[in-house]
UniProtKB/Swiss-Prot annotation:
A Pfam family reported for this protein in Swiss-Prot or TrEMBL: ubiquitin
Name of the featured protein: Splicing factor 3A subunit 1
Protein species of origin: Mus musculus
Phosphotyrosine: residues bearing it: Y454, Y757
Taxon lineage: Eukaryota, Metazoa, Chordata, Craniata, Vertebrata
Annotated site, Critical for binding to SF3A3, chain positions: L169
Molecular function per GO: RNA binding
Extent of Pro residues compositional bias: 366-382, 664-673
């Protein structure tokens, strides 16, 4: 055998071992997410960030871009997920890994790491998607109701241990002995401050009540409590479910709280980003004085307030209220349209005209198409139910009444539109002001002056008639002075006689009134008569009663001389012709003209302040107890009483021509009136009255009294029309009773009444017998003036 060169068997090439190593590397490369060869142009993130990027890319590749958007929304504030932003430097690496995972090239990383670390890493890798999925599931499951509260947990308040023991011990006894024990304890310890927690207004009362409930459940447990405890002891899973639900509820509450805080934070940031001082002037509009623009008309404060109320009503009630307001405005427009033709005829009332115009308009208009039926009305509320006893269900139902056009009534005081339901209250409030009559008259006058064009037909007719009466030069045949009617100059008003009431307070006023009514010619005639230069007219200057002209005059009866008292001095009587009445000499006070006086019953000199009641003239026999004077007696100057004409004496003398230069004579006072005068001719005073007791003895029984009421047209609230009121009263009644009856008959308050009987102002506190009132007595009623002197 030929031996050849011995060649040694070469050792196994290292490739075998090397080939083994790449296999391990390939196996390990399946776990290593990093590529075998780095890609040029991509920035690789650090290892801690690369792990998050790779895991996110794997989930995005499997779940789609919706999962990426969800992660971006949930982790918007997490800086570790900034690689999701396109501007981030690691975003290119993230996109590269997503494409690799979609193509199946990329694998999970597994570098030379201990096995324990690899297991932990795998656990964390598997834990992340589970967390994300758990979050997605938890967002869908929301706890509906809160878990039941803990029954045996009550946080003790911050009080001392002794007080806490007192509260707990009291709660135990109350739970054991019942509420009756609590009531007795409260009554017994109501003054003990340590038991103040038993009062409901105390701060520890709620804690005490909670303890009582807990002790009661322990001492007297409910029915299902034992079965529940037994079930939970046998099945701990149920307790865990309750705990899990409570935890989920706590997490849900926390998420809601965080969400609210985030919304508030976003809103705060948004407000903080606004620059409130940064603005841009886009355009400046200047309006010239003569420029005309399409602007709304100016509004008054009243219209502005009405618009604000309408807006508030619309915001509060919505569109329904606006519809009602539009309906009301349409009704008002119809009323305005109806009032325009109604002005042509003023003889009818406004309501009749409105009704007539409505009928005419309805007759002219085409009947509208049938509308949809109205929905049934709501059931009446209890306060609107009206029970009718005479209701007959079988009777024919009346036609539905037409809608009342007078829902709003015009107030006669203010002229405003007032609802009919509130008119009574409006009138009551409006009439509280006593000046509403003046305001109403003033407004009517102003309205008439403004609306003269629309005067009614009767006013125009009366105005033309008055114009024709006073312009006879145009409308008449007989011409008079312009502005005067035919026969107006002949008709003269009767002179109003000025009468002094006897009070010093009215002296100046009466004097002025007397001077205003006397002309210059009358003053000259009075001076001539006083000087005796002109024969006196006996028919005018005569004082006292006189007989009518058609009755033949008779001589005085001889029996009248017997009435002279024996104590009086002898008086010589001078016979006089019966046809000539005695003239009167009057005293004229300086600066006061002589006025013709009405005939008076008697002449008596009275002190100032007395009152002379005018009496009608009564025909009787001539007097003989008068002191004669020469016919040419000069005027006698008397001391200055009130500035009126004062008759001094009767001068019975035959008519003889007066002597121009008579000798002065001393003043002669008239004698007192005789007792034979009738009682109506004598002026009474309280001193001359008969005592009340004596008058009651002489007169018994009730008397009939007549009260003469004045005619005062300006006092419309009182019935003062000049009528006479007759009352029958006993003599013992006071004057105040008469005033009460006058108030009942006329409405005049007793405080405004002033009663006068035979020249005496009677007082309320005195009786009728005090003033000697007999049957047929006449009492004059007057108005008590305010602010004047007490009368």
């Amino acid at each position: 055998m030929q031996a050849g060169p011995v060649q040694a068997v070469p050792p196994p090439p290292p490739v075998a071992t090397e080939s083994k190593q790449p296999i391990e590397e390939e196996a390990s490369s399946k776990e290593d997410p990093t590529p075998s060869k780095p890609v040029v142009g991509i920035i690789y993130p650090p290892p801690e960030v690369r792990n998050i990027v790779d895991k996110t890319a794997s989930f995005v590749a499997r779940n789609g871009p919706e999962f990426e958007a969800r992660i971006r929304q949930n982790e918007i504030n997490n800086p570790k997920f900034n690689f999701l932003n396109p501007n981030d430097p690691y975003h290119a690496y993230y996109r590269h890994k997503v494409s690799e995972f979609k193509e199946g090239k990329a694998q999970e990383p597994s570098a030379a790491i201990p096995k324990v670390m690899q297991q932990q890493q795998q656990a964390t890798q598997q834990q992340l998607p589970q967390k994300v999925q758990a979050q997605v599931i938890q967002e869908t499951i929301v706890p509906k109701e809160p878990p039941p509260e803990f029954e045996f947990i009550a946080d003790p308040p911050s009080i001392s241990a002794f007080d806490l023991d007192v509260v707990k011990l009291t709660a135990q006894f109350v739970a054991r002995n019942g509420r009756q024990f609590l009531t007795q304890l409260m009554q017994k310890e109501q003054r003990n401050y340590q038991f103040d927690f038993l009062r409901p207004q105390h701060s520890l009362f709620n804690y005490f009540t909670k303890l009582v409930e807990q002790y009661t459940k322990i001492l007297i447990p409910p029915k299902g409590l034992f079965s529940k405890l037994k079930k939970e002891a046998e099945n701990p899973r149920e307790v865990l479910d309750q705990v899990c639900y409570r935890v989920e509820w706590a997490k849900f509450q926390e998420r809601e709280r965080k969400k609210e805080e985030e919304e508030k934070e976003k809103e705060r940031v948004a407000y903080a980003q606004i620059d409130w001082h940064d603005f841009v002037v886009v355009e400046t509009v200047d309006f010239q004085p003569n420029e005309q623009g399409n602007f709304p008309p100016p509004t008054t404060p009243e219209e502005l307030g009405a618009r604000i109320l309408i807006q508030e009503r619309y915001e509060k009630f919505g569109e329904s209220e606006e519809v009602e307001m539009e309906v009301e405005s349409d009704e008002e427009d119809q009323e305005k349209a109806e009032e325009t033709p109604s002005q042509l005829d003023q003889d009818t009332q406004v309501q009749d005209m409105d009704e007539g115009s409505d009928d005419e308009e309805e007759g002219q208009k085409v009947p509208p198409p049938p509308e949809t039926p109205m929905p049934p009305p709501l059931p009446p509320t209890p306060d609107q139910v009206i029970v009718r006893k005479d209701y007959d269900p079988k009777a024919s139902k009346p036609l539905p009444p037409a809608p009342a056009p007078d829902e709003y009534l015009v107030s006669p005081i203010t002229g405003e539109k007032i609802p009919a339901s509130k008119m009574q209250e409006h009138m009551r409030i409006g009439l509280l002001d006593p000046r509403w009559l003046e305001q109403r008259d003033r407004s009517i006058r102003e309205k008439q002056s403004d609306d003269e064009v629309y005067a009614p037909g009767l006013d125009i007719e009366s105005s033309l008639k008055q114009l024709a009466e006073r312009r006879t030069d145009i409308f008449g045949v007989e011409e008079t002075a312009i502005g005067k009617k035919i026969g107006e100059e002949e008709i003269q008003k009767p002179e109003e006689k000025v009468t002094w009431d006897g009070h010093s307070g009215s002296m100046a006023r009466t004097q002025q009134a007397a001077q205003a009514n006397i002309t210059l010619q009358e003053q000259i005639e009075a001076i001539h008569k006083a000087k005796g230069l002109v024969p006196e007219d006996d028919t005018k200057e005569k004082i006292g009663p006189s007989k009518p002209n058609e009755i033949p005059q008779q001589p005085p009866p001889p029996s009248s001389a017997t009435n002279i008292p024996s104590s009086a001095p002898p008086i010589t009587s001078v016979p006089r012709p019966p046809a000539m009445p005695p003239p009167v000499r009057t005293t004229v006070v300086s600066a006061v003209p002589v006025m013709p006086r009405p005939p008076m019953a008697s002449v008596v000199r009275l002190p100032p302040g007395s009152v002379i009641a005018p009496m009608p003239p009564i025909i009787h026999a001539p007097r003989i107890n008068v002191v004669p004077m020469p016919p040419a007696a000069p005027p006698i100057m008397a001391p200055r009483p009130p500035p009126m004409i004062v008759p001094t004496a009767f001068v019975p003398a035959p008519p003889v021509a007066p002597v121009p230069a008579p000798a002065p004579m001393p003043p002669v006072h008239p004698p007192p009136p005789m007792e034979d005068e009738p009682p109506s001719k004598k002026l009474k005073t309280e001193d001359s009255l008969m005592p009340e007791e004596e008058f009651l003895r002489r007169n018994k029984g009730p008397v009939s009294i007549k009260v003469q009421v004045p005619n005062m047209q300006d006092k419309t609230e009182w019935k003062l029309n000049g009528q006479g009121l007759v009352f029958t009263l006993p003599l013992t009644d006071q004057v105040s009773v008469i005033k009460v009856k006058i108030h009942e008959a006329t409405g005049m308050p007793a405080g405004k009444q002033k009663l006068q009987y035979e020249g005496i102002f009677i007082k309320d506190s005195n009786s009728l017998a005090y003033y000697n009132m007999a049957s047929g007595a006449v009492i004059h009623l007057a108005l008590k003036e305010r602010g004047g002197r007490k009368k």
